[in-house]
Amino acid sequence: MALHALTFLTTCITAVTVVTASSSTQLPFKPLPDLFSLTVDDIITGFSTNQFTSADLVSAYIARTAEVQLALRPVIEINPDALLIAQTLDNERLIQNRTRGPLHGVPVLLKDNIGTADQLNTTAGSYALYGSIVPHDSTVAANLRAAGAVILGKAGLSEWAFWRGTNNSNGWSARGGQVKGAYYDNQDPSGSSGGSAVAAGLGLTALAVGTDTGGSVIDPANINGVVGIRPSTGLTSRAVVVPITVVQDSVGPITRTVKDAAYLLSAMAGPKGDPGDNYTNAIPFTTIPNYASYCIPSGLQGAKIGIPRNIFPAPVNYTESDIQQIDAFNAILPLLASLGANVTDNADYPDIDAYNTEAQFTLALDIGFKHDFPAYMSQLKFNPTGIEDLADLLNWTQTFRAEQYPLRSTDFWENSLACNLTTDSPDYLAAIAHNAYLGSNATIQGALDAYGLDALVLPTAYSVRPAVFAGYPVITVPLGYFNATTTVVQAGGGGDPAVWGLNTVAPGIPFGLSFIGPRFGEAQIIQFAYAFEQATMIRYQNLPLAKYMPVTQLHTPVAQAEFECPDALGLPK
């Protein structure tokens, strides 16, 4: 376990040898792919034609991360063994002529709340977990290793997946500092998986993984111009993942393309009946689907798609942001029809009034975290802070300077501790059951059934919240960008301006389109999203700001990368 401070970037990329594609047996005249747009299929081709190796990829990704880390902080920590693992996988493929799985040699960046039993820390961005040792790999990490992936490192995130307090900013953590997006200066990365989305979008990794309790995969993917999938709750195991609540937590892919997300989801998912997560018992198949096989250009042919417009705000309340996103959405509806979809407009949610007035989002998280956090802590092999429960965590956080209390609040935890309900309380169980109704028959399932639909489609900003209550899958794919005359809007919640103030709406910032399907209907919504993506390729119509675009490529000769670690996290001296 790496216990030294600021361990991101292999001890901040101090004297890391970067092996470039020139070290491989490269076929002549074959151009190397750009890492900004590199796909898993490109990697498979590059490996099979000896254009480059896994070690080449890892080295280039580390160098690219070093180029943007000070400005954007998308990565908390690089796996100090990543290059060695990549070289081992290269040897297996090239010398032993064997592969471990479909992602053999492909680098993957994990959000820093996903447990790994290696030299990486798993901290949810907090020093409260720094140096802790998990009992074993999370099921997701173990699945990825079995598929042959290289765990490249840990991505920045909103501390505790933004379950700490209202006066905080998306993407900030004590360990990682402030993650920022790359499409506008001081861009809000959204959260809580902002680091994963920024890293995927800039080509700092082949693939990235986030977690989603209330939109934390979908929202960052939406605002950073990438693809995100919030899987059905239970399709991906939460074993050895720092929790908020098992009722809503999900672990999902964040990638540059739909097909890459499909590859990643197949590798991550399951198994059915994982002993570390009983929600996996609900998986309706014994073999995880090959989701990439559903990525066909004609995937919308005959699809029955509905638009539940009553989830939108009343037109009189539209903001400039609403207008641009809904206008862009309306503009692509003829395209969906031309691709063969049968689009039913105004396929509205049947009990939208109940959803709007009766949802108890915070109660589920208040009680869930108070219960599930101690369970996570109890399984650690080493717990250097001695924190056992939420009361301990609150007291520790309020006294450790790097956690920036009281500038950054802890009121979520205070409210949770003040609530006398437990996960066995009838009032809590009733609230969870009602939330499940509000996310299913009152909204998503109700509309699917009433109109005989395969899926729903919405601008991403309006798509995810009902789904989290009942565990429905959502995929987001780029739809557009705010135009050049857009008024800049800053995040705000009445808190300290030193904490708030990131730009959430601004010229050039992306926004997405979401498909929502029935429980465990990932295959169909992946199929629909892929067909839309291939017909539009909107991700490449606007690029991040040039100053935030890494320049290192596979062909870039870099002998060594020297990177000075800034003391920007407020560590005690």
Residue ranges and their predicted role:
Residues 2-88, 312, 321, 330-341, ...:
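An N-terminal boundary/leader segment
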Residues 22-214, 232:
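Gly/Ser-rich catalytic/binding loops embedded in alpha/beta enzyme cores
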Residues 31, 104-125, 299-313, 363-439, ...:
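Short helix-loop capping/hinge segments that flank enzyme active sites or metal/cofactor-binding pockets
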Residues 37, 54-58, 74-76, 107-110, ...:
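Structural recognition of the beta-strand scaffold that forms the well-ordered cores
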Residues 48-49, 62-70, 87-94, 145-146, ...:
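Sec-exported extracytoplasmic/periplasmic mature domains
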Residues 55, 89-107, 260-262, 294-308, ...:
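Immediate post-signal peptide segment of exported/extracytoplasmic ligand-binding proteins
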Residues 58, 323-348, 374, 378-380, ...:
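Acyltransferase
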Residues 67, 201-314, 330, 335, ...:
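Structural helix-boundary/capping segments
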